[in-house]
Amino acid sequence: MAKLTKRQKQIRERVDGNHAYPVDEALALVKELATARFPESIDVAVNLGVDPRKSDQIVRGSTVLPNGTGKSMRVAVFAQGENADAAQAEGADAVGMDDLAERMQGGELDYDVVIASPDAMGVVGKLGPVLGPRGLMPNPKTGTVSADVAGAVRNAKAGQVRYRTDRGGVIHSAIGRANFDEQALRENLDALLADLNKLKPSTSKGVYIKGITVSSTMGAGVRVDRATLGV
């Protein structure tokens, strides 16, 4: 059996995998164990009571975190005319149409978010094989296809997170960084859960939010007592 590292021993001593911690204690514990030499991302996994094999139970959406993600977001926008001008005014990192599509097909893909105005989807649609596998394909459900291009760019720059249930019915999202205080992380988590509740499929029966786990990039998952979040 492989020998445990000092960090692994510390985590094993501090985290009881069979215990669900009050949310504030869970967040404090995750921050305490985030000891890497960089500000680790604080992430949440939310297990939903849905059947992701059914198309009407796929949960997909976006949330503007009130305290952001702590990450500087690179945003590309497909738009023209006034929408292109508005995107540039909001700080988009790249704005264009066919020219931007050609650059992306050539490998220029170092963006966190790709946004498109509805009239640009004819151009963007051809990029499905390039953007789709990277989770960058614009979609109305996540607010990345929008007539309000300026607002979409503003939200992305402010720390909007996008998510979709995986094959196990779990949503994964960042809620901040290890250098955030617990209150900021809590506010971000509350905002995410509020939006997830709004997205509950009408065909989903029983308990909707079944489990919540928070973790840092290099740390262990810490289960959260749902009752302390009111869900």
UniProtKB/Swiss-Prot annotation:
One of its GO terms (cellular component) is cytosolic large ribosomal subunit. InterPro entries: Ribosom_uL1_bac-type, Ribosomal_uL1, Ribosomal_uL1-like, Ribosomal_uL1/biogenesis, Ribosomal_uL1_3-a/b-sand, Ribosomal_uL1_CS. One of its GO terms (biological process) is regulation of translation. Binds directly to 23S rRNA. The L1 stalk is quite mobile in the ribosome, and is involved in E site tRNA release. Protein L1 is also a translational repressor protein, it controls the translation of the L11 operon by binding to its mRNA. Part of the 50S ribosomal subunit. The lineage of its organism: Bacteria, Pseudomonadati, Pseudomonadota, Gammaproteobacteria, Chromatiales. Belongs to the universal ribosomal protein uL1 family. Keywords: Repressor, Ribonucleoprotein, Ribosomal protein, RNA-binding, rRNA-binding, Translation regulation, tRNA-binding. PROSITE patterns: RIBOSOMAL_L1. It comes from the Bacteria. This is Large ribosomal subunit protein uL1. GO terms for molecular function: rRNA binding; structural constituent of ribosome; tRNA binding. SUPFAM superfamilies: Ribosomal protein L1. The keyword RNA-binding applies.
